[in-house]
UniProtKB/Swiss-Prot annotation:
It is found in: Cytoplasm, Nucleoid. Signal peptide: none annotated. SUPFAM superfamilies: AbrB/MazE/MraZ-like. This is Transcriptional regulator MraZ. One of its GO terms (cellular component) is nucleoid. It comes from Rickettsia peacockii (strain Rustic). GO terms for biological process: negative regulation of DNA-templated transcription initiation. Residues 7-54, 83-126 form the SpoVT-AbrB domain. Belongs to the MraZ family. Forms oligomers. GO terms for molecular function: DNA-binding transcription factor activity; transcription cis-regulatory region binding.
Length: 149
């Protein structure tokens, strides 16, 4: 399967290393880079994570915007300018940069959340708060999904 699914909570050690769930690594197995691209989410206080192929799609999307627009500049700065390549070690761990950990409020635990073509890394309690709000929105907007095709 080529989508990121499910939710996992893993510990973060004193060196800021965290194990990426094995099934997430399996999805990334087809990528040219043995690791992930991570950047601060522009929607939530979390880290968005993807493979090189998704970053290329984001690049193509930003290139459709006016090259001198504030929007394009902001998106490119926040996504590409803040993105970091994180390589997997022999145990499937990555080292989370302090800037990303601070953005997400991550200290001792990280919550991995599959979102289809990307996954997010949250501070677990912050994700639970978000999940409660998301459940309400999903319930209220459920017909939108049915009408999407």
């Amino acid at each position: 399967m080529n989508v990121f699914l499910s939710k996992y909570v893993n510990g973060v050690d004193k060196k800021s290393r965290v194990s990426v769930p094995a099934n997430y690594r399996a999805v990334l197995g087809k990528e040219l880079f043995n690791g992930v691209i991570a950047y601060p989410s522009i929607r939530n206080n979390c880290i968005e994570v993807c493979g090189i192929s998704h970053i290329e799609k984001l690049r193509q999307m930003t290139e459709t915007l006016d090259p001198y627009s504030e929007e394009r500049d902001a998106f490119e700065t926040m996504i590409f300018g803040e993105a970091v390549q994180l390589s997997f070690d022999g145990e499937g761990r990555v080292i989370l940069p302090q800037s990303l950990m601070k953005h997400a409020g991550i200290e001792e635990q990280a919550c991995f959340v599959g979102k289809g073509v990307i996954f997010e890394i949250w501070q677990p309690q912050n994700f639970e708060k978000y999940l409660n709000a998301a459940q309400k929105i999903a319930h209220e907007k459920r017909l939108t999904l049915r009408n999407a095709h």
